[in-house]
C-alpha cells in the first residue's frame, strides 16, 4: 500500500524545504500543519493579533533575508491583510496563509464567509485560492517564486476550509516535496545591467563634476551596501541615503552626506540640490526620498537603477534608466572606468555635513529634563553594540532615529516602518527571532508601542529578548 501524508504535512515540509524555521500566526488555522511543523522543528509563534503576526513575519524576513510566513483563519484575514501593507511597501517577502469556506459554502451567507481576494489584491504581488488538493504543491512553490523575484513582496494563499482544514486534512502520496532552493532567499535570480547602458552611465559619471548617489530601499533589499561603498570610493562620489538605506555607510565615512528627502538632514538635501548628476540606486524615486519631487533641481541629469523596468523614469523625464539588480549593476559600473578624483566637490560636501552637525550638536548634548530625543539618540549612538539591529517605528520615531542616531560600525543595521504606526515592536520581535545572536533595539513611542503592547507576553513566552 502506498504511503500517504496529509495536506498539513505537505505544507510543513514545503515550508521547511524553503528554509522556513518560524511561523507567526493567530489560531485557529491549519492545525494539522502546525502539529507537523513542531515535529520538523519549526517554531510556531502564536501572536495576540493578526497584524502583530504579520509584522513579526515582516521583521523576520527583512533580517533573515528569506521568506517568512504568517497565518490566520478566515475571520482574521482582513486583519492579516492590513498588516501586509508595510511588507508591501518595504519589499519584504511575507507569505500569508488564510482559510476560507469551501466553494459550496460561498455566497450563501455562511458563517464568517467573505471574499478575501479584494482584501489582499492591493497589498500583495499575488493572491491565489487553493480550492483543490491538486493545486496545493504548485501554488506553494509559486508563492515563494513570486515573493522573492523581481521586486520582492508579500504573497497570499487562500486555502479551502474555514481554518484551511479541507486542504490540510486531504491525503497526498508521500514523497519528495517540490521546492526550489533559489527561491529560499531574496532577491532571487538577480539580473545584471545591459552592457550598452553600463557604458552610457559610465560616460555620464566620467563627465560629471558634482555627482551624488541617492541610496534607497533597493540597496538594503539587495544587500548592496559593500558594492555601493566600493563604487562611491572609486569615483569619489558622495552618498546620501533614504531612511530605508541608512545603514549603507557608517556615519564617519567621508562620503556619507546624510539622510535625504522629507525625514532628512539639511546637508543631504543641499548636496542633491548642488549636484549635476544624481544616481538613484535601488530607488523607485518616491516622494520621501526626493522631498516631494523637489530634489534634484529641474534639468539635472538623473540615472535610475531599479529592479522593475516599469518604474524607470516614472517621475523624472531626464532619466537614464537601467533595470536589474542594484548590487550587480554597481559592481559592473565599478570596473567600467579608472578611478576619479573630485577633491573640490568633496570639500564642498564635507562643509555641508560639518555645518549641519554643528547646528544639531547643542540639542544632541542638551542637559534638559526630561531628556530631549536628540540627546537620547546621541546616548544610544554611543552605547549601541557594534553588531546591533535597530528597528524603528514610523512618525517622529523614524525622524529622530533616522537623522540623529549615528551608526559607526559596518555591522550595525537600521530598519524602519514604511508607514504603519505600531509596526516597530512586533517587527523587532520578528527580527530577534531571525537573529537571536544579535542585539535588537526597538525605537518607538508610547503611541506606537500601545498598538501591540500585548505582544510583550509573546516575547516573554518565547524568550524573545528585544530591547
Task: Label each region the model flagged.
Residues 1-2, 134, 180-184, 199, ...:
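Phosphate/pyrophosphate-binding active-site segments
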Residues 9-20, 59-65, 88, 146-151, ...:
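Glycine-rich phosphate/diphosphate-binding loops that line cofactor/substrate pockets in enzymes
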Residues 11-12, 16-19, 24-30, 35-36, ...:
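Active-site diphosphate/adenylate-binding microenvironment
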Residues 21-25, 43-45, 63-101, 214-217, ...:
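A short, small-residue-rich loop immediately preceding and capping a beta-strand
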Residues 62, 217-303, 408-438, 452-454:
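Glycine-rich, anion-gripping cofactor-binding loops and their flanking helix/strand elements
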Residues 97, 106-112, 274, 313-315, ...:
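Thiamine diphosphate
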Residues 97-139, 245-348:
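Glycine-rich, acidic loop regions that bind phosphate or pyrophosphate groups
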Residues 142, 146-207:
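Conformationally flexible catalytic loops at phosphate/diphosphate-handling active centers
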Amino acid at each position: 500500500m502506498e504511503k500517504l501524508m496529509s495536506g498539513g504535512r505537505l505544507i510543513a515540509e514545503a515550508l521547511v524545504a524553503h528554509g522556513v524555521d518560524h511561523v507567526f500566526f493567530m489560531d485557529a488555522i491549519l492545525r494539522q500543519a502546525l502539529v507537523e511543523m513542531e515535529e520538523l522543528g519549526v517554531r510556531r509563534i502564536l501572536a495576540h493579533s493578526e497584524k502583530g503576526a504579520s509584522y513579526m513575519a515582516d521583521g523576520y524576513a527583512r533580517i533573515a533575508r528569506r521568506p517568512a510566513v504568517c497565518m490566520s483563519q478566515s475571520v482574521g484575514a482582513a486583519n492579516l491583510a492590513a498588516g501586509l501593507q508595510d511588507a508591501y511597501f518595504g519589499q519584504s517577502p511575507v507569505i500569508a496563509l488564510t482559510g476560507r469556506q469551501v466553494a459550496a459554502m460561498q455566497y450563501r451567507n455562511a458563517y464568517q464567509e467573505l471574499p478575501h481576494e479584494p482584501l489582499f489584491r492591493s497589498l500583495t504581488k499575488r493572491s491565489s485560492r487553493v480550492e483543490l488538493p491538486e493545486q496545493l504543491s504548485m501554488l506553494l512553490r509559486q508563492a515563494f517564486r513570486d515573493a522573492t523575484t523581481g521586486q520582492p513582496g508579500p504573497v497570499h494563499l487562500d486555502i479551502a476550509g474555514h481554518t484551511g482544514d479541507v486542504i490540510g486534512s486531504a491525503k497526498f502520496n508521500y514523497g519528495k516535496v517540490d521546492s526550489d532552493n533559489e527561491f529560499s532567499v531574496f532577491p532571487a535570480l538577480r539580473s545584471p545591467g545591459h552592457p550598452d547602458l553600463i557604458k552610457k552611465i559610465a560616460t555620464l559619471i566620467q563627465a560629471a563634476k558634482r555627482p551624488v548617489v541617492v541610496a534607497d530601499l533597493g540597496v538594503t533589499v539587495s544587500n548592496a551596501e559593500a558594492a555601493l561603498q566600493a563604487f562611491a570610493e572609486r569615483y569619489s562620489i558622495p552618498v546620501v541615503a533614504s531612511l530605508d538605506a541608512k545603514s549603507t555607510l557608517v556615519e564617519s565615512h567621508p562620503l556619507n552626506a546624510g539622510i535625504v528627502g522629507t525625514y532628512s538632514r539639511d546637508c543631504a538635501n543641499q548636496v542633491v540640490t548642488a549636484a549635476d548628476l544624481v544616481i538613484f540606486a535601488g530607488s523607485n524615486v518616491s516622494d520621501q526620498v526626493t522631498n516631494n519631487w523637489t530634489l534634484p533641481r529641474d534639468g539635472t541629469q538623473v540615472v535610475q537603477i531599479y529592479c522593475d523596468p516599469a518604474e524607470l523614469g516614472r517621475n523624472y523625464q531626464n532619466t537614464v534608466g537601467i533595470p536589474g539588480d542594484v548590487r550587480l549593476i554597481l559592481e559592473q559600473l565599478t570596473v567600467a572606468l579608472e578611478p576619479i578624483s573630485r577633491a573640490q566637490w568633496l570639500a564642498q560636501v564635507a562643509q555641508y555635513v560639518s555645518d549641519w552637525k554643528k547646528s544639531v550638536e547643542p540639542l544632541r548634548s542638551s542637559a534638559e529634563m526630561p531628556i530631549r530625543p536628540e540627546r537620547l539618540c546621541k546616548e544610544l549612538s554611543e552605547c549601541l553594540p557594534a553588531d546591533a539591529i535597530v528597528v524603528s517605528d514610523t512618525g517622529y520615531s523614524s525622524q529622530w532615529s533616522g537623522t540623529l542616531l549615528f551608526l559607526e560600525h559596518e555591522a550595525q543595521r537600521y530598519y524602519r516602518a514604511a508607514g504603519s504606526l505600531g509596526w516597530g515592536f512586533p517587527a523587532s520581535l520578528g527580527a530577534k527571532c531571525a537573529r537571536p545572536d544579535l542585539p535588537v533595539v526597538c525605537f518607538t513611542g508610547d503611541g506606537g508601542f500601545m498598538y501591540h503592547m500585548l505582544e510583550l507576553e509573546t516575547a516573554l513566552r518565547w524568550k524573545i529578548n528585544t530591547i
